[in-house]
Amino acid sequence: MILLKAQSIEAMETAVEYLENINQSLPSIINEYRNQNICDVSEKMVELSDGLRWLYDVAKLTKNYHSINEDEMLGCYAEIVDAMEMKDYLLLSDLLEYELLPLTENWKAMLIDSVKSIATN
């Protein structure tokens, strides 16, 4: 049980670092979509998509230690994928700015609080 707890803390700390990277890179991704620089931003979106899937997996595996709503995460991801498939880059940039960015900031805060709480117990 102690090993599982330590692994969960490590996974959540890594997720916090990744969320910080997402929060720093999202504004440039949003601007590139708004400026129709689709070729330039495509690789970044693939990396972001992979990262969001990884975050979802971490959230599910560590759900006993935090209050992140995985369904909310999955719903946001599905909307982003739909916008990408429709090639609606204005919608995509809005989803990234007004849906994903606030969610990632919230998830980061929740994970930080969870790690602190677990570490003191």
Q: Which functions belong to the PLM regions below?
A:
Residues 1-121:
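C-terminal-biased regions
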